[in-house]
Every structure is written in C-alpha cells, then in structure tokens.
Amino acid sequence: MTLVKICGIKRIEDILYVNKYLPHYIGFVFAQSKRRVSADQARSLKQKLAPGIKTVGVFVNEAVEKIVEIVDECKLDCIQIHGDETVQYVDTLRGMLHSHPSGRGVEIWKAVRVKDESYISLLSLYKADVFLLDAFVEGAYGGAGKVFDWKLASLAEAFGKVFVAGGLSLGNAAEVVKSIRPYGVDVSSGVETGGFKDEFKIRQFIDEIIQADKEMC
C-alpha cells in the first residue's frame, strides 16, 4: 500500500476535504511559503482532523529548540526537515525530541532535493525514519512543482523508507506507483486550483493511488 501525504494544509476547508478522503498524512508548513501556517493555526486545524490521519510539520533550517516547541504545542506526529540540515543537526534534533515528553515517538523525515545520482549517497549519512525526495530547483527549498528522475528513488530505497515528492499530480500519480512502488507519495500544488486545495483533485489523486496499488497486486 502506497501512503499518501497531502502537504500545505492551511484552511478549515482543507481539513474537511482530507477528513472525507483520508490520506495517511497531512503537512503543515512552518517554513517561509505561501502555504505557511502559524503554530496556533496548525493546532486549531489539528483539533478538527479525523483520527488516524497523521500530521507532519515541515521546517527549513529552523532552530532545533523552535521545532521541539512547535511539536509540543501542536502535538505533531512527524517532523520533515527540508533545508540544509546537517547530520549533526538531525542527531541533535532526535536527542532533544526523545528527551521531551511530547517528542517521544515523533518521526524525523529528511528531505533531499535530488539533482543526480550523487545526491542519493547523502542518505547513508542520516539517521532518518523517512527520506522524502524532491526535485532540485536552484534557489528553492521546495520542488516548485518540478519532477525529478524517479529511478533515483529506487536507488534511495537501499537507505530506508522513501516518499516521492515534486510535481506529482493527477496526470502522473499512478505512473510513479507503477514504475517504482515507493513507500509513499507527497503532493501539494498538484491537488490545488488557483492556489487552494481542490476537493475533486484530492479525491481523484487518492483514488488513482489506490487503483494503481490494486493493479500492482
């Protein structure tokens, strides 16, 4: 079963959509972005989230202490670090989470912006629960809706669980599942219309992933 994460949740309407179609994860972006939410907003939205949907906090080069503070305030299930975080940074973050009551059991996801095969070797250095592969775009920490070579994700699976992000949409959701069978897929702009989450696209995206999984059985 391919897991699905809908990232960039910021409105009560978005929560209503995901409660209806039940992705496995949703993402709250705390980094600078047009989808950015405050800790107060995320906490309020999470209170309305259906049981069983896990929350991922997305951070870029944030102070470790601030991340732990937001984890405590919002009761996040996972932390996705999407910047230039070092191996030492990740180890420090894990240690601080484990020493804090609200942080125990919180997963750490390390995002890597993939340019070529040489970037995959970086994964061996990190102790992460999940690796999220995104497209490399100069000057941007997100993939900006760009697709990378999915074959690289197959190589990354040697180092752990892999989520594929970057340019996923209704047009290619099933293709990525059938071609490399990743642990999970992450979508944001691919299920939006006019900069806002689109109920039809969310439903269709999840349906396409489910159908692709069935065809691969």
Named regions from a protein language model:
Residues M1-H98, R104-C217:
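Conserved N-terminal beta1-alpha1 strand-loop-helix module at the mouth
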